[in-house]
């Protein structure tokens, strides 16, 4: 399963949630699959989807899911310590781990080698951390959304690879305005 197939499998699950999606191809793929006004597409801030989603979950009570990539999380690992110590129960971080920087040419990340994002998240204080293959991601997200006592970090292991998608035809101001 690649990232596009994974995002497609989540189509019905995300509709009632506030979704913050990682820059580049993940946002473009999600837009192509099922554009919704409750989806906030990151257009140029690698590594910040998890931070923005965390802030949003603290500021209000709706369920928030940040969709981030392994490369972005590695770039902003300090956010895992904040998630581990401050994330409210309405927050879920989905890390799509394809072992590569998919939006910049599929260069390998260190999750292809010795770095375990599950161990990093647990070490950062995250209490509910699930690592699964892409096919099991939807079920694990449902579990997280139904748990009213914990925030979750879900690491979905998938194959690298990109599909050809058009850029998102929305400017940042329009994305923000319709997300409100």
Regions found by a protein language model. Give the residues of each.
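Thiamine diphosphate
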Residues: 29-97
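Conserved thiamine diphosphate
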Residues: 108-143
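Glycine-rich beta-alpha junction loops
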Residues: 23-27, 98-100, 157-162
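Generic beta-sheet signal
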Residues: 17-19, 62-66, 91, 148-156
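Long, charge-dense
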Residues: 96-107
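Active-site diphosphate/adenylate-binding microenvironment
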Residues: 1-46
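Short acidic, glycine/serine/threonine-rich loops at helix termini
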Residues: 31-33, 105-108, 164-169
């Amino acid at each position: 399963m690649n990232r596009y197939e994974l995002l497609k499998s989540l189509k019905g699950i995300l509709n009632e949630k506030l979704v913050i999606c990682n820059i580049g191809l993940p946002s473009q793929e999600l837009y192509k699959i099922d554009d919704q006004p409750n989806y906030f597409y990151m257009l140029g801030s690698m590594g910040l989807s998890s931070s923005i989603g965390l802030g949003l979950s603290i500021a209000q009570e709706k369920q928030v899911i940040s969709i981030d990539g392994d490369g972005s999380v590695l770039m902003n690992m300090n956010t895992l310590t904040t998630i581990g110590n401050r994330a409210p129960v309405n927050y879920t971080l989905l890390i799509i781990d394809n072992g590569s920087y998919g939006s910049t040419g599929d260069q390998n990340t260190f999750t292809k080698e010795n770095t375990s994002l599950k161990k990093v998240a647990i070490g950062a204080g995250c209490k509910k951390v699930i690592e699964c293959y892409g096919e099991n991601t939807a079920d694990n997200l449902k579990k997280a959304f139904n748990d009213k006592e914990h925030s979750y970090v879900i690491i979905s292991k998938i194959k690298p690879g990109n599909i050809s998608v058009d850029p998102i035809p929305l400017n940042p101001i329009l994305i923000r305005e319709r997300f409100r």
